[in-house]
Amino acid sequence: MQRNYARSFLAMTATVFILMGVLLMWNWNPNTSASASRGAGTPAPGQPAWRLLDPIRYENLTIFPVVSSQDADTSDFATLDDALASGQAVVTEQGNYMRRTRDGAPDARAYSGAQVNQLVLVSRGKKPLVLLAGEVISGGKQDRIIGKDRIIPVGAPPLPLDVFCVERGRWTDGSAKFAGAKMMAHPSVREKAAVDQSQAQVWAAVRGQASMSSNLEVSRGASAGATASAGAPASAPPVLSSSQTAEVIASVAPTESYKQIYESPRVGSSVEAFAEQVERRFNRSTSGLKGERVIGIVVAFGGEVAWSDAFASSQLFEIYWPKLLRSYVVEALTRTASQENASLDDARDFLRPATGHYREETEPGVYSWRESTEGKSAQIELEALAPKPLTLHWLKVLRAN
């Protein structure tokens, strides 16, 4: 009898230790989920568990949707395009806005003159305002792009806004206020702002788009059928010859306006046609999801995984997706046509967190901006600190140089 009790006790003890071991292994990585058995990783510690869907391919662009069963509530945050359109935010050149004290009197420290790399942002809304590096705003003396991910708190006084110019040559008054262009600078330009934070390199990247002509040859259309998904239309987007593209670039000289180049009828039609093909495949790939939502993407050009944008919620992703997609398309059009394709394993490897040089900037009680660089990889996280800590945006890029 005692022997049986002893055996039962030992068996129960062993079971308890096994269960404890399983729980400890499960909790070692706070992002572990059922998808981990499929090899999916996580964008950043503390983010919801997620997995990658099969790749969506068109021409030399491959997109891997990132889906999650956990979807944060981000409805308490406003985005730049919406805030500018509704008047909840105003962006002007320095010197165009009179700063006032709390009692309404003019502030003697009012901003002096216009500056290339700094504007003034006034937030009047009742929600914190989210800004992402690379968002294009048009107006003032030159079109600009936002220089860094950040959050503007409710009730903030007029703030200096770090930006980069994407319209070299013009320095004359346009609209007094800036408007959201509903555009995101494509990765080659966005990287120079978000990671390198260099005006000279941003300008060089914008000017370098003349080289897109070498990748907009009619020969690209011949390869579309080889890379199109089964059952999908194989037609290629309208393309421009080298001379046609050079003509478009020349027509907007000397301002070298990023916005004008990519809104021109000929270049713009190529971008839109390309984007429609990708979006059709994307919608078909993600339409049957059950209990999961798309929160981000991993992007490859040819066989090289080069970029990823992920968000805390499907709501934020859906807001940014249209202009993100077109930015990836512009990048694909500027890159050499390739028959190589990145694999799902390549995308998973790319999402391995960078563990090299680390730096952090924090506005207490508002947000934390973190950057990690390792080799050619750079990873940036924007975390809201109120009303509770939440990583709103996660970016990883394979730097060009």
Predicted regions and their residues:
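N-terminal secretory signal peptides that target proteins for export/translocation
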Residues: 1-6
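Intrinsically disordered, low-complexity segments enriched in small/polar residues
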Residues: 7-129, 134-401
